[in-house]
């Protein structure tokens, strides 16, 4: 049983060796790298080589790369967003090109997965042209053609919008997106906003190939450490046991004091391990 941390925790800074060493120092074995160019410039070969070296120094495994969702993130301010489900063809193509670059970076880092957002969360007030099913299907097909020859799998993330609930994504995987090497990233916090987390886990079932573990109050996407919000973790983890999930467990957290967040995540890990093995 392996656990990792998303570099989303350090999203506002340029990803460096110290961040990865800090994650490893708290007992984590893996990392998911958040691909925003102001954080990790997946277009820059030297930046990719640098992170590759930092991972080796920290003895961390690159579990996944999170596809870009924004052009930049500085001082708490988000830049223009990317959506592979955008109905405007130029916007869709730009998002696909950025994601394709992140897939190639994942391959270079040895990360077997790239996590994709099916459009833009409703809370971010997407334009009327965004979150189109036909655009999303076309984009995933194009990205699958990039990822499949590299041996990289695409994980469609459960997010709070009309495309991103577990049932809608399963319907796509069993219909318009019946492609090899596709799966789901079960995000517990997003599932909690959408409804019942354990139900989402069971609906996703064997399609789950990645996780984002975080908690909230059921309304705001606050990315809290598990066991600090409203999620019923014993029931949720029982659902994961029921579907036979054996992949990496990734914490996707935020906080102004990363070291403190990691300490709390390490304690949450121990509780999760106890619940999964009891």
Which residues fall in each region the model found?
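Active-site beta-loop-alpha junctions enriched in small/polar residues
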Residues: 6-10, 34-36, 67-70, 119-121, ...
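Acidic/histidine-rich catalytic cores of soluble enzymes
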Residues: 2, 30-31, 37, 131, ...
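A structural motif
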Residues: 28, 106, 111, 208, ...
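Active-site acidic/histidine proton-transfer and metal-coordination neighborhood
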Residues: 17, 57, 74-183
């Amino acid at each position: 049983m392996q656990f990792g941390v998303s570099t989303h925790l350090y999203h506002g800074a340029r990803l460096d060796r110290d961040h990865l060493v800090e994650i490893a120092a708290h007992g984590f074995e893996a990392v998911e790298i958040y691909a925003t160019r102001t954080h990790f410039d997946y277009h820059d070969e030297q930046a990719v080589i640098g992170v590759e070296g930092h991972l080796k120094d920290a003895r961390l495994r690159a579990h996944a790369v999170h596809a870009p969702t924004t052009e930049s993130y500085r001082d708490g301010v988000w830049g223009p967003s990317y959506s592979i489900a955008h109905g405007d063809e130029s916007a869709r193509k730009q998002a696909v090109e950025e994601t394709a670059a992140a897939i190639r970076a994942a391959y270079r880092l040895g990360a077997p997965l790239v996590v994709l957002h099916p459009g833009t969360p409703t809370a971010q007030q997407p334009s009327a042209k965004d979150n189109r099913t036909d655009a999303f299907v076309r984009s995933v097909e194009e990205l699958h053609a990039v990822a499949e020859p590299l041996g990289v799998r695409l994980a469609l993330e459960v997010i709070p919008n009309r495309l991103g609930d577990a049932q809608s994504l399963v319907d796509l995987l069993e219909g318009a997106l019946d492609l090899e090497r596709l799966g789901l990233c079960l995000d517990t916090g997003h599932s909690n906003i959408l409804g019942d987390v354990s139900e989402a886990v069971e609906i996703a079932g064997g399609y789950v190939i990645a996780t984002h573990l975080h908690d909230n109050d059921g309304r705001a996407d606050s990315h809290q450490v598990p066991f600090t919000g409203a999620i019923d973790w014993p029931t949720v983890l029982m659902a994961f046991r029921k579907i036979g999930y054996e992949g990496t467990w990734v914490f996707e957290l935020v906080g102004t004091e990363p070291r403190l967040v990691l300490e709390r995540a390490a304690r949450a890990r121990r509780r999760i391990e106890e619940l999964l093995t009891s």
